[in-house]
Curated annotation (Swiss-Prot):
Residues 25-36 have a biased composition (Basic and acidic residues). This is Late transcription elongation factor OPG110. The gene is OPG110. The keyword Mitochondrion does not apply. Interacts with the DNA polymerase processivity factor A20. Interacts with B1R kinase. Interacts with the late transcription factors VLTF-1 and VLTF-3. Interacts with the late transcription elongation factor G2. Interacts with itself. Might be part of a transcription complex composed at least of G2, A18, and H5. Belongs to the orthopoxvirus OPG110 family. It comes from Monkeypox virus.
Length: 210
């Protein structure tokens, strides 16, 4: 065990060895445990260097990957097409013995046109049938509409005729009343002209019974 004297203590006042020994003994008993050269209880911190966290790069979007893959596929397809053209040009016979590419293209186009014309004929027939069917359906709808209109007009005519007959009856009754009143007036007038005075009608006087 190592002994040490610190500068904090003032040793100028010690005159005897016994006092020095007592002071050393007290300092040894009251000293901090961490002052030992090889302390057992003190935990020595690790001296590992601090490592920074590595930030993982974000994954690119799926669209970018798809575009890259599409580009790679296109490049591969272009390379394959170029190789195929090169091999066909190398293995193809001279133009005198085989028909030209333009002739082949023209023949294929002519065949496609013939096929398209043949396919167009039934399509035209189908469209004509559709037009005829639509025209017939339109005519049938128009006929139904006209029939309904005629029925409604007939109903209106019957109602109007009924109203007119009722009005004629009322007017006839009024005319007959006016005619009767007119005839009464004419008779009174004729009596006044012929007799010169109106007829006196004696009224019976009611007698009260006692």
């Amino acid at each position: 065990m190592a002994w040490s004297i610190t500068n904090k203590a003032d040793t100028s006042s010690f005159t005897k060895m016994a006092e020095i020994r007592a002071h050393l003994r007290n300092s040894a008993e009251n000293k901090d445990k961490n002052e030992d050269i090889f302390p057992e209880d003190v935990i020595i911190p690790s001296t590992k260097p601090k490592t920074k966290r590595t930030t993982t790069p974000r994954k690119p979007a799926a669209t970018k990957r798809s575009t890259k893959k599409d580009k790679e596929k296109e490049e591969v397809e272009e390379v394959v097409i170029e190789e195929y053209h090169q091999t066909t040009e190398e293995n193809s016979p001279p133009p005198s013995s085989s028909p030209g590419v333009g002739d082949i293209v023209e023949s294929v186009a002519a065949v496609e046109l013939d096929d398209s014309d043949g396919d167009d004929e039934p399509m035209v027939q189908v469209e004509a049938g559709k037009v005829n069917h639509s025209a017939r359906s339109d005519l049938s709808d128009l006929k139904v509409a006209t029939d309904n209109i005629v029925k409604d007009l007939k109903k209106i005519i019957t109602r109007i005729s009924a109203v007119s007959t009722v009005l004629e009856d009322v007017q006839a009754a009024g005319i007959s009343r006016q005619f009767t009143s007119m005839t009464k007036a004419i008779t009174t007038l004729s009596d006044l002209v012929t007799e010169g005075k109106s007829k006196v009608v004696r009224k019976k006087v009611k007698t009260c019974k006692k």
